[in-house]
Amino acid sequence: MEEMVSQNTEGDKSIDDHWQTEGAETQPGLHETFPLGVLKARVALLATAIGGPDHTSEQEAAPYKLGDDCLACLKDLKRWFVLVDQKQKRWDVASAAAEFRILEEDLIPILVQWEQKMSQGIKQSKVSGLPLSECIKNKQYHGKIALNAFQLMVWMTWPMTLNEESSKNQVHHYSGLKKHQLAYKKAILQAHGGKVVKAAVRIATEVIKIDRLDRSVQDNSLIRLVLNFLRNILAIEPGEVTVSAKQLSKSRNINTSDMLPPNISVDDICLNSVVSVFKKFKVFPFLLTISSSMGHEFEAEYVCLPLLEVAFYLTKDIDPHLLSLKADNPPQSLQNCGNKVSNGQGVVSGQLGMELIHLLDKERHHKMSQIRSSSTRHSRFGGFFSIQTPNNGRLTISNGHSALDHDLALNNIDKKKKWNKTTRNTAEAVQGIPVGVLNGEFNLTFLSHDNRSCLKWFLANFVDSSFNILLKNLIDYFTADEFNQQILQKLQFLLFYAWFLKFERDRCQKGETDGIFVSEALQDTSHILIIKFLREAHELKKWPLVHAAMLAITELLNYLDVLGEDWEEDVVGIYTKIFSNERLKLFSTIPRTASRHSLHYVKACINMNHAIMTTLERFNKNNKDLIIKGFRKRMITRFIVKEGKTTSGDVNGNKNGQDTTRDADEDAISSDEETNMISARLDFKKVLDAYFNGTVIDTYIFYLKHFTELTEEDIKRVLYFLNHILCSNEESFLFRVDFMIVLKEMLAPGGLSVTGHTRIRINEFSDHFMAKLKRKLEKSPFWYINILFPNLHDRELGYYLRYGQQRPNTQSIHKVVAPTMFKHIEGEENMSEQQLKDLKIGVLVSTLLDDGKNHFVEEINRIFKLVVEGYEKHYQNNERSATLHYPRVDFRSDMFDMKRALLFDSDLRALMTTLGYHVADTEVEPCYIGGIFYFPDLSSALNSLEQYMAIPFHTPNGLPSSSYLLRSIDYKSGVDADAKVGEAMRIDQFSDEMADMALSENANRYFEDLNRMEERLEGKQIPRGTAKKRSAIKPKSRKSQPTGIGGIDDDTPVINKSKRKKQLFLSNEFIMDSDDEEELVASPIFYENEIYLRFILNKYQGNLPSHLFSVFSRFANERGRMAGAVVGDYTDLFNGPVPSIEELKSMENSTTHHGLKEILQLQPRDHLSLSPNNENNSAHSSENLSSDSENDNITNDIPLSDSEYNSSNSSQYANTAKTSIIDPPSSKTSLLKLALTHEADVESEDDFIPRKRARKVRLEDGEEY
């Protein structure tokens, strides 16, 4: 109950702000614990003073009469609820109010009386034409009383739950209050024909009459209060709640007695009674009005969650399939009863009749089972056995069949054992969630023919008009406010989503709709939110939420399966997003722990698996490719396959090569360099492999053990998965004793029905399974022992036990780098082949030694020397002079990191290639030497290697050895594993001149950066407080742009297929747009303050005392507020009166004039670069530099904001080679244009160059943001 109060917004609290303040003054002990006796006495006094029956009336039924202080008493009672039940976590006030029957004897009569007065007044107003206020006496006063009584009724009927934070007092009162709420529900539904519900709807309609723009927060809260009242009526039921296992259960008294109070039956509070009252007082049209107009006439934040709860409690116990059946075709269990059931003694109707039918059906099945297994009266004579146990106990068996059937005898003994009651998994118990909410089965809910038709009409109209609107607002709520969400709300949302998709699926199958009315459920936001709930709940181990999410995903897949051809493109698009690699990995992980949970949880898990597998298998059988996409960095390649490598026929193929096909073939992935996205075809075989796990088999066997509780459809889903195991060479997972026992029990006489189709399927599967087992035992006799124990999880041994052979040693295939290329060598045309090879060996050896890789070179020299000596011994001297075919010798080394260097060191790979080795293309391939060689060439290569290891190598050009090498910029990125290295090494299209130019260009940029370093350091030495100018933006030349690998342009083919970054483009619609110049002009006060700041800094020689900084800040802020005027005393800052701005400007002009004149006199004439505007190329005089146009008010320029005006952020312009002097513009407009052009260069570092702020819009993938 305190949850309801805590959920009230400011609008709810504003309803009674006056009495809350008054209560704080009149009640001295706000948070004190009142004695229970005193509290009950005060509640009793309030109950008496509210009102009571008027026995002085002449009417036969005494009418209810309000007390003189009825309104004040109701407010006091509300105050007690807040002060005690909410703030102290006690339910003493609710218990006392239930004891004195306040709701039945006071609140209900007050609301019924107010409803009658309002109804009569409206009729009288229509007849007489008078205003309603004149037809009803004290209308406003009675309205306040009805409103306070209604709010109390909502509080007293609020659903009650226990959790770990519940106090002992709440646990103590829980059982009694639950029974009282059942009595409340009966009274509300039956008192005066249920007119309390009509009064609640009238309270809401009074608010609906007000225009939306004129409604207050209190008005919107009243609509929500009415919806909460309807929700309370639906939610009250004699159910159980889960409580924490950490709390003691001795003092709870929960479930120790019947939850139904005296004189109340199930029919009084069942859903059939609620629907009858709702239909009578037009509650369903009211709900349709609220839900269909959400967002237009009603605020969604007030009504979306209450509507969700109303829809959830209205449908949670109803099977959508029963509602979709026609009235003349009821289900088989109801064909013999209709609305009434005869039990041989009388007629029973309603909910009790439904339960009686269920019990009679169970009794019939038990009798039939007893007849099949029992013997006749004559054969029982003498059929009694007694067995003495080792502990002197005795087991007795009767029945003659026990003597003939040993299994039946043992089963009879087992039935007499006292088994410990199975305990529910405590991890599934989430606080406040009723146990029956996730039972996975729809309870037996009786609905009369009229009520069923009415409910179906409402739900169909709700789907057609309101489902999309409500679902969209709920998704917005759950995606926007993630911190205030309760797990119960998420669970209700998921079950609401699943139920209505199932309901719409039945309608689609009958042709009543085409699926457009639940299109919001097919949006990306919907299934993304559902899978997000699933992932988060699985990580946090919130198993009820996982259960609900699995139901929602299952219904979504089943619904997509029934949509027509018009939806085919949309359905495939949804499949590609649902079946991404990350989500498939999550789906295949959930069944591994399902066997630890309840049977209904396992059922939901198996149904989800079945929906996923059948969907993917349908694509596989129809030879349709399901293309999934993902980002390059996050793409998991576990479930994808190269195009054309796997077909539908490969699904049942051999498993021995599974590990090699499981490896990621990145060349199979279709990549998009521009968008950084990759796509590939989903492989059904690999998806099945993810489910072939011992723990997943445990889940299916656990589910199959309860075959007596499963339907024929449930068993078919299990057999579907087990058949895939048998057909995929994974049958060893099923070679288990417990699985064989389950099959034996199902085929036993007391198992499945002999005439059912399920038994035939199980029998066929059993024959196939036993044939597989027989062949396995003949091939591998060790399975006689292995079958008795659980499966081994050892990687090598488990593989041998399953497949009868050793596990192949395979590795993942990754990329390797291409060997280093050689640039043009001077005079190579005049060299012989042997001389050029000797030079290349010297270059590579010298480069490796310079890089500190001498240990690699020594190891290569040692192994290569052994190879040459072996070849020398193998052939005769006369044979070594010819070109012969030499045997293959693999390169083997025990040196640490040698193998990695042979794959990812391009210089080392180039040396091996030069010596005659074949370098590896992939990680799994070896490096070897062999083939047709001329032996003197090998000997010469060995001599060159040893020579340059001992003697320093001198390059012909005098530069380092690496200057002859053409390397890749990124050494980690190489050629694809499946590509030929020789193809990647082609450089015919790269001219040596281009490579030389690229290398020299890179070197020039490097030295230019070093030269500019001194200029950047010198530029930092500027006076304090002086802003740095920003150099004009110039278009970058082609030479300054980064090039590709080795200086080669990106447009040409490159050596390695490296991944390129996604390019970002700038829109040219905004760059330097100077149309709206007036909007960018700042206040002139800002620049005047800058003049004052420069004056003060110059006065103190750039070292302004710390205490004067705050004084100047106060001075600048005052000038900004007073439009340039100053009223404060700033004598200390200026050492006298404040100078005028005109004086400071004239001082700065004269200082600038003399300073620039001296600079010009010192500059050589040859170094002056004149403005292109001067046709005579004559130098400007000093008068020109001090002209009025240059010293025009700077406040007319385009400024930076205060936060942007920072000298540290200003770019520096340092060019000591030339000094460019710009002819001063003659107007402000020309100054603006000149400041914003790319060619404007300014010579003085002290000049302030205003710049315009340009909005930069980043365009990615061709889209504008």
UniProtKB/Swiss-Prot annotation:
Keyword DNA repair: yes
Biased composition, class Low complexity, residue ranges: 1171-1188, 1201-1211
Places the protein is found: Nucleus
Alphabetic keyword roster: Cell cycle, DNA damage, DNA repair, DNA replication inhibitor, Meiosis, Nucleus
Polar residues bias (residue ranges): 650-659
Gene Ontology BP term (one): maintenance of DNA repeat elements
Region (Disordered): 650-670, 1019-1052, 1167-1226
Function: Forms a fork protection complex (FPC) with CSM3 and which is required for chromosome segregation during meiosis and DNA damage repair. FPC coordinates leading and lagging strand synthesis and moves with the replication fork. FPC stabilizes replication forks in a configuration that is recognized by replication checkpoint sensors.
Name of the protein: Topoisomerase 1-associated factor 1
Gene symbol of the encoding locus: TOF1
